[in-house]
């Protein structure tokens, strides 16, 4: 029985220093319809907001990188939630108004549509035939990175994971940067 996670990309770039003053974009797309009538004051304010968003996104990326190898059949939901949130606090500090945990971790396993969560004394464990979506958030100055990822161990679910991933990327490309 293969207990490797399906559909998780290899991490190719090193984690960035979260105290950096510059977070380069990891991925960019060309768009025809972008806002181009921004004055200098708006541009300065926008740059500050983008910095907060990129820092939050980088923290989220590092937490995903940390947690994915820990996802295995037999692991308790509660243990994963605790480790994930502890890693966020380790990287960003205690959850406060400046930066930290954007919202508590939620799970969706199999037929559960969204927002289940582990509670104290929860004994549920991840199983080989489960399809798991793990959703968590980080924030900097209120700019929340809300991102989820889906994993499975059983190869029968690979087409489901591949089609979901393709649909997500197509939606991102179609939405563009000016969607509100």
Each language-model region and where it sits:
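Active-site neighborhoods and metal-handling regions in enzymes and metal-associated proteins
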Residues: 1-180
């Amino acid at each position: 029985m293969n207990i490797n996670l399906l559909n998780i990309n290899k991490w190719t770039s090193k984690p960035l220093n979260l105290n950096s003053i510059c977070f380069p974009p990891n991925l960019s797309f060309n768009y025809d319809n972008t806002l181009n009538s921004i004055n200098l004051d708006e541009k300065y304010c926008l740059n500050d907001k983008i910095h907060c968003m990129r820092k939050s996104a980088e923290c989220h990326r590092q937490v995903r990188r940390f947690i994915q190898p820990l996802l295995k059949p037999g692991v308790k939901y509660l243990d994963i939630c605790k480790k994930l949130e502890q890693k966020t606090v380790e990287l960003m500090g205690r959850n406060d108004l400046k930066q930290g945990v954007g919202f508590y971790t939620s799970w969706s396993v199999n037929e559960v549509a969204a927002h289940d969560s582990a509670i104290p004394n929860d004994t549920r464990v991840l199983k080989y035939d489960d399809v798991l979506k793990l959703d968590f958030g980080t924030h900097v100055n209120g700019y929340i990175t809300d991102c989820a990822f889906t994993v499975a161990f059983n190869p029968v679910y690979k087409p489901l994971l591949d089609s979901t991933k393709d649909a997500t990327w197509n939606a991102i490309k179609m939405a563009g940067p000016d969607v509100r």
